[in-house]
Curated annotation (Swiss-Prot):
Protein known as: Protein SLENDER RICE1-LIKE 2
GN (gene name): SLRL2
Gene Ontology terms for molecular function: DNA-binding transcription factor activity; sequence-specific DNA binding
Biological classification of the source: Eukaryota, Viridiplantae, Streptophyta, Embryophyta, Tracheophyta
Annotated keywords: Gibberellin signaling pathway, Nucleus, Repressor, Transcription, Transcription regulation
Motif range (LXXLL motif): 283-287
Stretches for region SAW: 379-454
Organism: Oryza sativa subsp. japonica (Rice)
C-alpha cells in the first residue's frame, strides 16, 4: 500500500480508518474505509528484526520512537478535526472552534506539513476555519480566483500527473470511434478552458484512413474580460494547429456561465454533421443537495441539461467525473469521505514527485487546485457549493433516467490509457475497466471515471416536439438579434467563427 512520505507510513486508508474510528462507525458503505485493509506499521521501514541480522541500532530505535510520536499526533489530529466537523454540523460552534484550535496546536509541533498527512490535514483545517470564521458575509460567498489564476491552476494540475490526461484520452478515443466514416464532425465542449484536450484529437483525425473530416469545435467558456476574448484566443490557436495538420477546421465560442442556460439551437448544428458532446468534470456542478433533490417538486439543473443533450441525438456524449462521494447533505459525511479521497490524491502527487527524484512536495499549482476543491466541499453550502462529486453508479442511474444509453469504452481505450500511464509506472497508478467504464486508480482507490453515452432510441422520438420548439426559438432569436449567430452571452457568434 502506498504511504505518505512525511508521516511514518500513514496511507490514505489509514486516514479514512482513523476518521471513521473517531465517529465510532467504520461502515464501508458510508466512509469507504475497510478497517481490515488499514495498515499501521509498528516499525520504521527497515526496522523489522530478521533472524540472523544485527538488532536495531540506537539511532534506529530513536527514529522509531520519534515516528511513533508522530503517528500519535496524526491520529489525534484526525480525531479532533472529525470532532470539529461534527460540532459544526450540530451547531456547537464553540466546541468546533476548540477542537480546531487543538488540532492546530498539534500541527505546530509537527516537524513538517509540506508533505504527508500533515499537508492534507492542514488543507482540511483551513477549510474548517473558513467555515467557522468566514472572511466574507454569508450572503456573499468567497469569489473564485481571478480567471488568469484559474487557468494557471488548471494547467498546473494537468501537468502534475495523469489525472486530466487520462480524462482527455478516454474521451477523445470515444469521440474518434464515434466519428468513424463521417465527413463533417462537430465537437461541443462544455468547458473549453485553454483547449488543451483537442490537439490530440486533431492529430488523430489528420491521419485517419480516407483523409480528415471537416472538424468544427464549439467551445463553452466565460464571458470576455476587459479587452481579452479568451474563447477567441483559444479558437485561433486551435485553428492554427489544425492548419498545420491539414485538417479543415472551424471554431465557435459560446460565452455562458451556466450550462443549464443553454439550448440546442445555440450550437448551430449543420445538417449532416456528426455531433459529439464532451463534459470533463462539469456535470457535478449541475447537482443539488441529495436531500433537497428528493424533496423538490421542480427538476434540478442536471435534468434540463440531460434533456437537451438527448434531444440533440449526439453520436457520443463523453462524461468524465471524480469517482467520489462528496454530495452528501451531512457535513460530517462529506468531510470524512473527502478526507479519504484527497489523502489519496495528495499521496499520489507525492509519489509522482519522489518517482521523478523530487522531495515529495509536488507541484504547488496542482496542490492549490485541489485545495480549492477541498475548500468548496467543506466550507460551503447551498448554491455556492459546486464540487458535488458523485460515484459512477449514481451517474449511471441519472444518465439513464435522462434518456441516455451507455456505449462501452472498449479495449482500445483501455490499452491507450494504460500506455499513457507508462510515464507514471513506478508511482502506483492503474486503469480499470468496470462495466464499460474506464477508471483511473491510485492503488485500490478509484480517482476518476470516464464513460460514453448516446441518446436512447425511445427518447429521440419524445424529443422531436422539443426540437421543433427550439427551431422556432432560434428563428425568433435570429430575428431579434439580427442574425448575430445565436450564441449566448452576446459578443460571440459570427465574430467568433474561425475557419481555415
Amino acid at each position: 500500500m502506498a504511504q505518505f512520505g512525511g508521516f511514518g507510513g500513514w496511507s490514505a486508508m489509514d486516514v479514512a480508518a482513523a476518521a471513521a474510528a473517531a465517529l465510532g462507525n467504520v461502515s464501508g458503505a458510508v466512509y469507504h474505509a475497510d478497517p481490515a485493509a488499514a495498515v499501521y506499521a509498528s516499525l520504521v521501514p527497515g526496522m523489522a528484526v530478521v533472524p540472523g541480522r544485527a538488532p536495531p541500532s540506537a539511532v534506529q530505535i530513536e527514529a522509531a520512537r520519534r515516528w511513533k510520536e508522530l503517528e500519535k499526533m496524526a491520529l489525534r489530529s484526525v480525531n479532533l478535526m472529525v470532532t470539529c466537523a461534527g460540532a459544526i454540523q450540530a451547531g456547537d460552534y464553540a466546541a468546533a472552534a476548540g477542537s480546531l484550535s487543538d488540532a492546530r496546536e498539534i500541527f505546530a509541533k509537527m516537524p513538517t506539513t509540506r508533505t504527508g498527512i500533515g499537508r492534507v490535514l492542514t488543507h482540511f483545517a483551513d477549510a474548517l476555519a473558513e467555515r467557522l470564521f468566514p472572511a466574507f458575509p454569508q450572503s456573499a460567498p468567497p469569489p473564485p480566483p481571478p480567471r488568469g489564476e484559474q487557468r494557471e491552476l488548471f494547467r498546473g494540475f494537468y501537468e502534475a500527473g495523469p489525472y486530466l490526461k487520462f480524462a482527455h484520452l478516454a474521451a477523445n478515443q470515444a469521440i474518434l470511434e464515434a466519428f468513424e466514416g463521417c465527413n463533417s464532425v462537430h465537437v461541443i465542449d462544455f468547458a473549453l478552458t485553454d483547449g488543451i484536450q483537442w490537439p490530440s484529437l486533431i492529430q488523430a483525425l489528420a491521419v485517419r484512413p480516407g483523409g480528415p473530416p471537416f472538424l468544427r469545435i464549439t467551445g463553452i467558456g466565460p464571458h470576455a474580460a476587459g479587452n481579452r476574448d479568451e474563447l477567441r484566443d483559444v479558437g485561433l490557436r486551435l485553428a492554427e494547429f489544425a492548419r498545420s495538420c491539414s485538417v479543415p477546421f472551424a471554431f465557435r465560442g459560446i460565452a455562458a456561465d451556466q450550462l443549464d442556460g443553454l439550448r440546442p439551437w445555440m450550437f448551430q448544428v449543420a445538417p449532416g454533421e456528426a455531433v459529439a458532446i464532451n463534459s470533463v468534470l462539469q456535470l457535478h456542478r449541475l447537482l443539488v443537495d441529495q436531500d433537497a433533490a428528493a424533496a423538490a417538486s421542480f427538476p434540478a439543473p442536471i435534468d434540463g441539461v440531460l434533456d437537451w443533450v438527448a434531444s440533440m441525438n449526439p453520436r457520443v456524449f463523453t462524461v468524465v467525473e471524480q469517482e467520489a462521494d462528496h454530495n452528501k447533505s451531512s457535513l460530517l459525511e462529506r468531510f470524512t469521505n473527502s478526507l479519504f479521497y484527497y489523502a489519496s490524491m495528495f499521496d499520489s502527487l507525492e509519489a509522482i514527485s519522489r518517482h521523478g527524484g523530487g522531495d515529495g512536495a509536488g507541484n504547488p499549482l496542482a496542490e492549490a487546485y485541489l485545495q480549492g476543491e477541498i475548500a468548496d466541499i467543506v466550507s460551503r453550502e447551498g448554491s455556492s457549493r459546486v464540487e458535488r462529486h458523485e460515484q459512477m453508479p449514481r451517474w449511471v442511474e441519472r444518465l439513464r433516467r435522462g434518456g441516455m444509453t451507455q456505449l462501452p469504452l472498449g479495449a482500445t481505450g483501455l490499452w491507450q490509457a494504460a500506455m499513457q500511464l507508462r510515464e507514471f509506472s513506478g508511482a502506483g497508478f492503474g486503469v480499470q475497466e468496470n462495466g464499460g467504464f474506464l477508471t483511473l486508480t491510485w492503488h485500490s482507490q478509484r480517482l476518476y471515471s470516464a464513460s460514453a453515452w448516446r441518446a436512447t432510441a425511445g427518447k429521440k422520438m419524445t424529443m422531436m416536439a422539443s426540437g421543433a420548439a427550439d427551431a422556432m426559438e432560434e428563428s425568433q432569436n435570429s430575428n431579434t438579434n439580427g442574425g448575430g449567430g445565436g450564441s449566448s452571452g452576446g459578443g460571440h457568434g459570427a465574430l467568433n467563427q474561425i475557419m481555415q
